[in-house]
Amino acid sequence: MARWLGSGGVDQIILAVNHLSDKLKIEVGHHVAGVTVKFSVEQTPLGTAGPIRLAANLLGKDDPFFVTNGDIVSDIEIRRMLEMHEETNAEATMAVVSVRDPSPYGSVLTDSNGKVRKFEEKSAVPSPASHVNAGVYVLSQSVIDSIPGGRSVSLEKEVFPKLVRNGRMQSWMHKGFWYDIGRVSEYVRANHELLQKQEPKAAKPDANEDRREILRPSYLGTRTHIGVGAKVGPLAILSDNVSVGDEAIVRNSIIFEETSIGGKATVEGSVIGERVVIGKGSRIGHGSMIAGQLSIPEGTMVSPNSIILC
């Protein structure tokens, strides 16, 4: 995200943090991809708008600024989005994307000029294809003044509806890469789309290479070990120091650093965090996520869409 924002001309990022903020400061540091990083710490959760008000003293006094959700991955052209924001004299500009089923998100209705006219709530019933909020905004400084201080405030339910009523909210239609990686399935899909955009990296051949199966596109980090008879890929992403045991199967999955997949284990369509041990003969159901340096006992059957954290 820092690289994406930096490529669009952003030179400073403010991270609104709460839980585990001290750990995040250590992990992220104060410079990422040439961009300066500052932290605004919430003592209690302040919703989606409250953190903007809290961080006001870290922002410039006159220039518009971007707000983006932390679980969005995209290639939105933020330079052009900012230009349109200024050309239309909007107070807020929201990036929108077209999805087949907007029911998990709610729809954004616009006029022929792209001005936002109405928001429709999330629905449990699948809906026709429509535009949804992409989680990336340009806001003018005047928006900060409209956010009440000292309490949790929602951009989507309190701030934006008022701007829409006053005709001060514009949309920016994005037709490129966009994923909401807050869901395991979307996180996996986003990584796989990026994987297919670049030349995949295969393991270095050794004497027993013909007894291993590595199907492209896949990515293998440094010092990965693939056991005899193991099958990796397609669409497998193995980070550094990952071990895949003899006759194990890893497909359509993301495996983080220093994780071990035991012999004859199967991992499909899942995300396995760093330093996790998957016992021999275990089966990890599609859509699952395991993290927290856990050890899964030998022969364990993990149901599809399971979330197992320490």
Question: Which stretches of residues belong to each language-model region?
Answer:
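Acidic/His-rich active-site region of diverse nucleotide-sugar glycosyltransferases
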Residues: 47-49, 105-121
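A short, conserved acidic/glycine-rich loop-to-beta-strand motif
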Residues: 88-98
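Conserved N-terminal catalytic core of the sugar/cofactor nucleotidyltransferase
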Residues: 1-69, 78-80, 287, 291, ...
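Glycine-rich hexapeptide-repeat left-handed beta-helix
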Residues: 246-310
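Extended, small-residue-rich solenoid/repeat segments and analogous flexible loops
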Residues: 151, 164-252
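Catalytic-core segments of class I nucleotidyltransferases/pyrophosphorylases
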Residues: 64-66, 73, 79-86, 100-102, ...
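Residue-level recognition of short loop/turn positions
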Residues: 69, 112-113, 223, 229, ...
